[in-house]
Amino acid sequence: MSNITIYDVAREANVSMATVSRVVNGNPNVKPTTRKKVLEAIERLGYRPNAVARGLASKKTTTVGVIIPDISSIFYSELARGIEDIATMYKYNIILSNSDQNMEKELHLLNTMLGKQVDGIVFMGGNITDEHVAEFKRSPVPIVLAASVEEQEETPSVAIDYEQAIYDAVKLLVDKGHTDIAFVSGPMAEPINRSKKLQGYKRALEEANLPFNEQFVAEGDYTYDSGLEALQHLMSLDKKPTAILSATDEMALGIIHAAQDQGLSIPEDLDIIGFDNTRLSLMVRPQLSTVVQPTYDIGAVAMRLLTKLMNKEPVEEHIVELPHRIELRKSTKS
């Protein structure tokens, strides 16, 4: 049966439409026997409450928008899983949209979701500009960033301390005796790379009294192919690095394979550390040492923070930093 309305359910259960509405919205002020009668009528008629219509009455649609840069990325799909699990726990539905890391599309999706009357948005994106921040401020509903960096720290966010994470990885390589350490970064247009990761790299070198060599910084785009290209560039230099830190595991795989194609042995000739601890780190030989970013937890905590903001619960920290660690495997000398 199609187009069953709340009126049909009320008539079938012999109750008022207000009572049906209270049952559908989980209002406790309904007698158990009446609730049972209404739920049975809903089941019999196949009634599906319309989230937006319910939202007009309750001012809530129990729907959350999630904007993701690359739906095919192992990293972002794991983040989305954390978001989804907590959303389900708190009985929120999710609208998931892929932005292709395109600013215009991100801003368009933001407005599209607000038009769908979502109760809140989890936003993931590499390059958060002043335009983004202005849109976030204009939003009538809360927005939380997940694994994303906004330099002014005005928008609630959940991530790790990326500057410290890169610093720790470089320091580990310094402590292993390396003095020629290269860094394969993501796009420098993105604050996460320019303001956080690159600064961590520079700080670790400075504290070890090692010079910063601009040629040892190769800019990639997070992909396997850009890892291949980075290694080819670094090995074409007169002075070659003895260790490479990659801003993602996927680029690190490209680095390892390109090095092996050149006849280099990992880790005997070159120590390599990745970043993110995606399952790719276990699929390569030698298995990849990597900075562990608690991806699933970032998604889960971001969604929980959003539920608090949507329900106007007290929030102690708007900028949440989760712990990171380094998992040493076989791509670094023991």
Swiss-Prot record:
SUPFAM superfamilies: lambda repressor-like DNA-binding domains, Periplasmic binding protein-like I. GO terms for cellular component: protein-DNA complex. CDD domains: HTH_LacI, PBP1_CcpA. Residues 6-25 bind DNA. PANTHER family: ARABINOSE METABOLISM TRANSCRIPTIONAL REPRESSOR (PTHR30146:SF150), LACI-RELATED TRANSCRIPTIONAL REPRESSOR (PTHR30146). Global transcriptional regulator of carbon catabolite repression (CCR) and carbon catabolite activation (CCA), which ensures optimal energy usage under diverse conditions. Interacts with either P-Ser-HPr or P-Ser-Crh, leading to the formation of a complex that binds to DNA at the catabolite-response elements (cre). Binding to DNA allows activation or repression of many different genes and operons. This is Catabolite control protein A. The gene is ccpA.
